[in-house]
A protein has these predicted regions:
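Single conserved hydrophobic/aromatic residue that forms the stacking wall/gate
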Residues: 1-20
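Terminal peptide-recognition signature
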Residues: 19-22, 185, 332
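Short glycine-/small-residue motifs
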Residues: 21-24, 189-190, 336-337
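Juxtadomain coupling helices with adjacent low-complexity linkers
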Residues: 27-108, 114, 141-149, 341-388
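Serine endopeptidase catalytic core focused on the charge-relay Asp
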Residues: 38-45, 198-305, 351-354
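Sensor-regulatory modules in signal-transduction proteins
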Residues: 328-330
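Short, basic/aromatic recognition patches
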Residues: 4, 13, 140-179, 204-205, ...
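Intrinsically disordered, low-complexity terminal regulatory regions
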Residues: 63-199, 203-215, 219-220, 384-388
Length: 388
């Protein structure tokens, strides 16, 4: 452990033989946040913040929800440490040269917005100012290449006028990855606006695939075939159809994946149908999202794996429970979905909405027409005054 001025390293190097220490690569969790036990991991993290600690006035423990103070940490950083300067450490630094791999992204302009396209899912233009050619659906009545372009262009045009939630300086525009998938989860188009976060490339596809998957007529059968019939039964118990009769946004799927549903201080604290119950739930045991990827996750401990799940292409990089995607329809028939990732989830939702114009779900089957345990499911949520 080498942090600034080695403060965290020094704590780890002390004699903590009777406790679990983060240097053994074992994760820990706090099943009872009401007690005052202190984990070595938390002490190490706090030691690393010496000189760089968050101002007290903006820490999470300054927030009260229904009279309950949100915890920040169960420990305090040490008063001081005799730190070791990096230059005084023994040994010879080794700086291994790393060549940058060639990129699979090519400059392109979509709807007048400059960005990059993945050459695996589009024919890039010879000139960055020109549009790419996206892929047509192979399904009868599916999205054409021009319709994929239209959808991505509409989303891209909204992104450049959307006030970002995660960027400085204030007043910056959102920068996102935009993905459109077919009914079988195949990627029809990917576009990344300039300087969009790299992680969004994968997450945008996950979001699109999630909305498409849960909205498809075969969702229940597909989950059962993947050994996840428990979640199908839980959805049925909540009178949730996984037969294509409901159009699910990713915001709705996210609500149903929470360990407390409905969320809020006055909940009965039962879990959503796609979540493990409280007492069993943890960030390492979430529910359907993790169970779909668990086999490949374990396999990755012994070497690289080709894909995140053993599922078919519909969700073979897993599902996502963050908002920012909606299914796409033509003449009332599901033809795929659009997913957005790269800014706040409300901003992603807004940009996904813009992209879906012309291919929106019939209002009467949207998830916000469904009530689960007395609480309506959401469809999308937009920020107030979102445009620059």
């Amino acid at each position: 452990f080498f942090f600034k001025q080695k403060t965290a390293y020094e704590i780890v190097s002390r004699d903590w033989s009777s406790d679990v220490c983060s240097s053994d690569l074992v994760y820990t969790r706090d099943p009872d946040s009401s007690d005052d036990d202190q984990s070595i991991e938390e002490l190490v993290a706090l030691a690393g913040t010496i000189g760089f600690a968050a101002p007290t006035g903006i820490r999470a423990d300054q927030i009260f929800i229904d009279g309950i103070r949100i915890p920040f940490a169960n420990a305090e950083p040490p008063a001081g440490l005799s730190t070791i300067q990096y230059v005084s450490l023994s040994g010879t630094p080794l700086l291994a040269p790393i060549d940058s791999p060639s990129t699979g992204f090519n400059p392109a302009t979509v709807g007048g917005v400059l960005g990059t396209v993945d050459s695996g899912f589009a024919t890039p233009p010879l000139n960055a100012a020109d549009p790419p050619t996206f892929t047509s659906s192979l399904a009868a009545g599916g999205l054409t290449a021009d319709e994929v372009y239209q959808t991505i262009a509409q989303a891209a045009q909204q992104s450049v006028i959307t006030r970002a939630a995660i960027r400085n300086p204030l007043g910056s525009r959102a920068r996102v990855s935009i993905a459109v998938v077919d009914v079988d989860g195949s990627i029809l188009g990917l576009f990344r606006t300039l300087d969009a976060p790299i992680f969004g490339f994968d997450v945008a596809v996950q979001k699109a695939r999630t909305a498409n998957f849960f909205s498809s007529p075969s969702a229940a059968g597909d989950l059962t075939a993947l050994g996840q019939s428990t979640y199908v039964s839980a959805a049925n118990a909540d009178r949730l159809s996984l037969n294509g009769s409901i159009a699910y946004s990713d915001r709705a799927d996210g609500f149903l994946s929470q360990p407390i549903y409905p969320p809020g201080a006055y909940s009965n604290f039962s879990n959503g149908p796609y979540s493990k119950p409280l007492g069993t739930w943890s960030i390492f045991n979430t529910g359907l999202q993790l169970d779909l990827a668990q086999t490949q996750l374990v396999a990755s401990l012994t070497g690289p794996v080709a894909q995140c799940t053993t599922a078919p292409s519909k969700i073979n990089n897993g599902i996502q429970i963050f908002p920012g995607s909606v299914p796409l329809y033509k003449n009332g028939v599901l033809v795929g979905a659009i997913g957005i990732s790269g800014d706040g989830v409300d901003q992603d939702d807004l940009i996904a909405y813009a992209g879906s114009v012309g291919f929106q779900a019939p209002p009467e089957i949207r998830s916000d027409t469904v009530t689960v345990r007395g609480t309506p499911l959401p469809w999308q949520v937009f920020p107030r005054h979102p445009n620059l």
